[in-house]
Amino acid sequence: KEQVPFLASEPLSDAMVWSKGNDYTFRLRPSTYMQAKMLAEEAAKLPAKRWVTVAPNYEYGQSAVENFKAALKELRPDVEFVGEQWPALGKIEAGVTVQALLRERPDAIYNVTFGADLAKFVREGSLRGLFDDRSVVSLLTGEPEYLLPLGAEAPEGWIVTGYPFDQIDTPEHDKFAEAYRASFNEEPMVGSIVGYTTMKSIAAALDKAGSTDAGAIIEALSGLEVDSPFGPIVYRSADHQSTLGAFVGRTAVVDGQPRMVDWHYAKGGDYLTGGDEAAAMRPAN
């Protein structure tokens, strides 16, 4: 409407670049679709067949569940989803939710809650034995913003997407992390990576455009290559989604502190649809 270029940094909604995508909007973070596919790839290796899901009842949670189901069923046609819980965001009744999931006798759980809801879910689930002898796959839970506040109560062995901020040993991340610690005297979080890479992307786009004209900036952002602390990324011309990835691993508690272990970096571009398919999902101009 306003015809102003917009680089969305934190939002995860698939609609932003697909069903409601437009010429002016670009997105940095790996989307719900991308991260759900990353987790489904690991979930498919589990023996679990009976799955339940728990997610906040709004677009993010709904699309996270829908994408995970579709991706896992494609890899493992034998699995079945036997129950769903949809707590209101920020208002989870954790005891009720946990009991409802227990009644379904699942082999595994897919969790999309985060923040205060996650802490309540973890506490009640642990008290009531929900996680005993069950696999849990959990979106975003390895991000330090959500994992560190759990402290020694953090669950162990969950398969998560996240950011093992103190374990990555690459030149590009070392350079960023050292500068960040020197500037702020604290460890970087996912938000730190996102904020830094957003600013680098905008600067690169302005430099390439050579002006602040909206059309020139859009043209510059389409196909733009940027160096991030996770390595080089590209903003795809087809849908304006960047190829920034995420780390996938398991949760653990080491010396009383939660952390990610057994992790690997999942390149964002490997978990996106083809360019033609993405373009077809966008509204016609």
Name what the model sees in each region:
Residues 124-196, 207-212, 260-284:
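Extracellular/periplasmic periplasmic-binding protein-like sensory domains
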Residues 213-230:
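Short, well-structured alpha-helical segments that form the helix of a local strand-helix-strand
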Residues 10-18, 22-127, 164-175:
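Extracellular/periplasmic Venus flytrap/periplasmic-binding protein
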Residues 5-14, 135-141:
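Short beta-strand elements of ligand-binding domains
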Residues 53-56, 187-193, 214-217, 233-234:
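Surface-exposed patches in mature extracellular/periplasmic domains of secreted proteins
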Residues 225, 229-285:
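Solvent-exposed, acidic/polar segments of extracytosolic/periplasmic ligand-binding ectodomains
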Residues 35, 64, 117, 194-198, ...:
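Catalytic-loop motifs flanking and including active-site residues across diverse enzymes
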